[in-house]
Amino acid sequence: MPKNNSKPLMVYNSLTDKKEEFTPINKGNVGMYVCGPTVYSESHIGNLRTFVVFDLIIRFLKSQGYKVRYIRNITDVGHLEDDGEDRIAKKAKLENVEPMEIATRYTNDFKEQLRQLNCLHPDIEPLASGHIVEQIQSIEKIIAKGYAYEAKGSVYFDIDKFRKSYTYGKLSNRNIDDLISNTRELKSQKDKKNSFDFALWKKADSKHIMKWSSPWGDGFPGWHLECTTMSQKYLGENFDIHGGGMDLKFPHHDCEIAQSEAIYGNQPANYWIHTNMLTSNKKKMSKSTGNILLLTDLINDGYFANAIRLFLLSAHYRSVLDFNKKALDDANSLASRFFDTYHNLNIIDIELKSNELNDVNNKKPQISRKELENIDVDCKNALLDDFNTPKFISELIKLSKTIDKIVNKKLNINKGNLEYLNEIFMKHLDILGFDLLDQYMLYSQIEREAKFGLQFSMEKSGELLDIIEKIRSKARAIADYDTSDFIRDELSKLGYEIQDKD
């Protein structure tokens, strides 16, 4: 019998620190908000890990029949340094350009990197600078509830007042008294009642470029406010999933919860999902430590974008992932393997149509529908268990090996089961976010002829073999032995033997 296919989706909820069965607010629909980048510099692969993980989560939810509304913001104003200066404005001063030029440059760069990694576009990608009016309205609501105060043109969230009715620090489980004793006094904080109060609105001096009019004077919104405002606008005051990197738990997400409770009296999201960090030589990858790795550099070094995506998914999202060259090399090989498996499915289809498998391989074991259903269930169950991508990839490798057995004529399959096998493989490859077209285009023209020429027309197989052999001869003539050996080995897998005369 096929394996049990009725397991629920279990999600680790950072709010409760345990796995919980996922139950959406509205059956069949999922509202998800993921904190996007602050666009003051190029995103490195440690930043990109979060967005690749949530891309897979969205793909899986959609494969399970959910209609997902995915919101991912762009922070183009309001992310403050410890000295109270906006990060984007600070970078603009260094480069002597307009702040929005910095924001636009790195927003475009971020989107291009996610395109290369085959990430789906969010349904809405709001800019913080495009929601100033709504953020001012949020501040007014918090003030009206008594949880914020104005001080010399700035507005701060009153954590002491908030603590009388709610718990602050639910996600990080930070002890507020420890925070108070360990918070250093900064010049920019002198107007606060308490050093741990956070800014909802910051007064801007006359030289500040990124500023807007407000009831409290010219200024700009605080970083934490934008996500509360925009998630509420596009998903409502209570939605299903809020995601982001683990480093956002405190203070950003704790502050979001506080703001939402101050305005609406309830937490914004039912499930909080946090991705862990990427390290390099066991040290956190960050701009401040100078050990960042850029996607463009890795691609220029010869790694497939698919491979980088596979690497970022190779560890469970809640685990620390350490970068090393061997792991990336292995991911590169695996990307090639999955593409070869896709190609092999086409070969099997051609051979079935020509009756070659039935004639030559009729005494070999026949893979059954139940076996294929079990493979499908194993892949699905891996992701039902808190999006366990290492297990999911492992099951896909098993599936790939099964297809290898068929193409190597160690296992037989009928046409109906082949169609189902192809459906399974393509479905899970899509959930993985594997970009077949991108992988194909990265092969050289010679490699394409060698790898894919046979699948187009069995009727002209002799002509195609002649062309492929000519390509191989030209490769040998210019001492391109990697390509010539590649062609020989690939043809050998198809049952064709090439003997070199020299």
Model-derived segments and spans:
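Structural preference for alpha-helix termini/caps and helix-kink/transition segments
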Residues: 292-502
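N-terminal, positively charged nucleic-acid-binding surface of large information/translation enzymes
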Residues: 16-19, 25-118, 138, 498-500
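Alpha-helical recognition segments enriched in aromatics with Gly/Pro capping
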Residues: 1-40, 55, 112, 133-347
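Short, glycine/charge-rich beta-strand/loop segments that flank catalytic centers
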Residues: 71-77, 105-110, 120-135, 153-162
